[in-house]
Amino acid sequence: MTSPGLSRRRSLLLGGVAAAGAAFTMAPAGANPRNTAEGPWAVELFTSQGCNSCPPADVYLGSLAKRPDIVALSFHIDYWDYIGWKDPFASRATTDRQRAYARVLKQRYVYTPEMVIDGIGHDTGRDRGKIEALLGEAQRRSPRRATPELTRGSDGRLAVRLAAFPLDGEPADVAFALYDRRHSTPVASGENQGRMLDNFNVVRRFEVLTRWDGAAASWSVDTADLQQGQGVAVIVQRADHGPVIGCNKLEPMVSG
């Protein structure tokens, strides 16, 4: 969906991250480091609960989120909040991220739903074949990945480690995301009035940790606020919203 001048989108610093102290069991760290030939690759969905075109893309992102070769993140934009329903997960920072991608990818406008694939291309997500084609293109362009190794200690801090990687003089941004794995929201007004909307991997906290020069490095991130039902991801991409060159995720164990 598009709007006069700019389309329906949502932003980054999402509110209400759960309080610290809850018991949380992460997936085994040994399963996390990946062979560089295996990805993962990043899929970022820009969406809004106020847009009636978005629910099918939200469901599709939920299926992509189950794949070990994909880091799937849902960013809720805020520019459709005026049309009858205020998305509880939206923020201006998310909208700013989408607009930055639009500039880099030379889009005339922003729209929802929009899936940005590994920072190299975009589509609505309605045609899954187009998304798979973009994923294939991402794999061809970036067969060797700067895949971060993620481990979380008993002190609640996330260790992020990157091996040396040839950046050819072009720096990269290392960004951290904390996300809720699923939300079901009854929508009382707006275009989706009366519907129960399911959203997946909803980003609640997003920050650029550093600008990286390609030398072996490590960082520590405070994740004491992490709760059951949440996950964390790290995205490494060419500076200023360029192509993604590596990413990884760490999620809680799911029983049953």
Describe every region a protein language model picked out.
Residues M1-A19:
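N-terminal secretory signal peptides and thylakoid transit peptides that target proteins
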Residues L6, T25, T223-Q227:
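Short alpha-helical interface patches
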Residues A22-P28:
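C-terminal segment of classical bacterial N-terminal signal peptides
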Residues G30-L105, Y109:
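Active-site-proximal cofactor/substrate-binding loop regions of enzyme domains
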Residues P88-R108, I120-G256:
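Short, conserved sequence motifs used for protein processing/export or organelle targeting and
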Residues T112:
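A conserved catalytic-core signature of glycosyltransferases
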